[in-house]
Amino acid sequence: MNITQEEFDAYVDVQMSGVTNMFNVSVVSDYSGLSKEKTIEIMTNYEILNNKYGH
């Protein structure tokens, strides 16, 4: 599954906001606008994506 910079940024925005526990996939999906599948993909590959997109 391909994750874009915009999708990763949406995930990081929720993470930095502190509004929810990041393991609550449903809430993270709602706040970020990402599908649950994409949210899980970002969680699984966070380090790789973080290195790729420079956060």
Mark where each language-model region is:
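N-terminal acidic leader/helix
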Residues: 1-30, 45-55
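Short, basic interhelical loop/turn and adjoining N-cap
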Residues: 29-41
